[in-house]
Curated annotation (Swiss-Prot):
Pfam families assigned to the protein according to its UniProt record, in alphabetical order: CMAS
Tissue-by-tissue expression: Highly expressed in rhizomes. Detected in roots, petioles, flower buds and leaves. Expressed between the developing stele and ground tissues near the root apical meristem, in the immature endodermis, the pericycle and the spokes of developing xylem in the apical region of the root and in the protoderm of leaf primordia in rhizomes.
Catalytic activity: norreticuline + S-adenosyl-L-methionine = reticuline + S-adenosyl-L-homocysteine + H(+); (S)-coclaurine + S-adenosyl-L-methionine = (S)-N-methylcoclaurine + S-adenosyl-L-homocysteine + H(+); heliamine + S-adenosyl-L-methionine = N-methylheliamine + S-adenosyl-L-homocysteine + H(+)
Pathway: Alkaloid biosynthesis
CDD domains registered for this protein in UniProt: AdoMet_MTases
Any one GO cellular component localisation term in the record: cytoplasm
Principal location class: cytoplasm
Gene symbol of the encoding locus: fCNMT
Alphabetical list of InterPro entries matching this protein: SAM-dependent_MTases_sf
Active site residues according to the UniProt entry: C336
GO molecular function: (S)-coclaurine-N-methyltransferase activity
Name under which the protein is recorded: (S)-coclaurine N-methyltransferase
Coiled-coil positions: none
Reported function: Involved in the biosynthesis of protoberberine alkaloids. N-methyltransferase with a substrate preference for (R,S)-norreticuline but also active with dimethoxytetrahydroisoquinoline.
Length: 361
């Protein structure tokens, strides 16, 4: 009940004010973390149903609805915000392999560089890659996996696919520097592209979250798999429920804090067991969210230690606007803080990484 004589600000106005303060770096990290944890708790209350019957119904209903959608939506919006950033910035924030996804920390003393390699090695092991295999890396980012596979398996042909010009140019330049003649980079949108060849192994790391119609996507990828080919997928997930990455209600400021609303799906750990029309699941693993939480923590440490180097880069890409440059720095700080809290929630036992190995039907 409102106190007489005092005007209560509308919730939307409060959230707008909060987001403005976050943009300007006016909220202490501890307070940001606390606010994020509150929203994550609300998401758990929203997603965890009171009966298992309701839980499965929610999951199955989402799989049915996705089958009615396009393969992907709002790809350009996400690309502009997340992936078209200066390579020099990524060289500062990421490890030496420029792996922009979950890394694998074997123990407390593992460095970010070691964790990058450990995860790349785990991909190769779980995908059962052998020297001489033809390998397709879909949504290759800055080429961490492409370059690692090409260097490790000298007799393999590795094809990377990206829809980013800067990523393509960087991977091609790195291939030349490393004298790798077994790398090809294609500039393409995988939702519309028709691949002329088939591959022994197809690797997809943290791309499926940005897709919608997995039935059509997997049907498309199946056509690119050799007869005995395997598809390895890494995706982030919640252990129990899946959801469109959209605000729960008008109080949910967090969902739009890092990613544009509606551009992502957060699958459940078991989500892709429901999409076996064209491929079959061979194996399935999960990794504690603590690995991705620590990855984000290491990224944030590097970012904070090099803010003075990063500022001029962002001033350049924001049209010589220092205020916009600081907003961009604060955005990336928020990205890391969000990842730390989300994947670290409940000791890494809520949101985590899932690995799925498929074979062709």
């Amino acid at each position: 009940m409102a106190v007489e004589g005092k005007q209560v600000a509308p919730k939307k106005a409060i959230i707008v004010e909060l987001l403005k303060k976050l943009e300007l770096g006016l909220v202490p990290d501890d307070e940001i973390k606390k606010l994020i944890r509150i929203q994550l708790g609300r998401r758990l209350q929203w997603g965890c149903k009171s009966t298992y019957e309701e839980q499965i119904a929610q999951l199955v209903n989402l799989t049915h609805s996705l089958r009615q959608m396009k393969i992907a939506t709002e790809v350009e919006t996400l690309d502009d915000q997340m992936y078209e950033v200066p390579i020099d910035f990524l060289k500062i924030m990421n490890g030496s392999n420029l792996k922009g996804s979950c890394c694998y920390f074997k123990n407390d003393s593992t460095t970010l560089d070691e964790a990058e390699i450990a995860m790349l090695e785990l991909y190769c092991e779980r995908a059962q890659i052998k020297d001489g295999h033809s390998v397709l890396d879909l949504g290759c980012g800055q080429g961490a996996l492409t370059l690692y596979v090409a260097q490790k398996y000298k007799n393999s042909r590795v094809t990377a696919v990206t829809n980013s010009v800067s990523q393509k140019e960087f991977i091609e330049e790195e291939s030349r520097k490393r004298n790798l003649s077994n790398v090809e980079v294609l500039l393409a949108d995988i939702t519309t592209h028709k691949m002329p060849d088939t591959y022994d192994r197809i690797l997809v790391v943290e791309l499926f979250e940005h897709m919608k119609n997995y039935e059509l996507l997997l049907r498309k990828i199946k056509e690119w798999m050799a007869k005995d080919g395997l598809l390895f997928v890494e995706h982030i997930c919640h252990k129990t429920f899946a959801y469109h990455y959209e605000p729960i209600d008008e109080d949910d400021w967090f969902t739009e804090y890092v990613f544009p609303a509606g551009t992502m799906i957060i699958p459940s750990a078991s989500f892709f067991l429901y999409f076996q029309d064209d491929v079959s699941v061979v194996n399935h693993w999960t990794l504690s969210g603590k690995h991705f939480s620590r990855t984000n923590e290491e990224w944030l440490k590097r970012l904070d230690a090099n803010v003075e180097l990063i500022k001029p880069m962002f001033v350049t890409i924001t049209g010589q606007c220092r205020q916009e440059a600081m907003k961009l720095i604060n955005y990336w700080r928020g990205f890391c803080l969000s990842g730390m809290e989300m994947f670290g929630y409940n000791n890494g036992e809520e949101w985590m990484a899932s690995h799925v190995l498929f074979k062709k039907k």
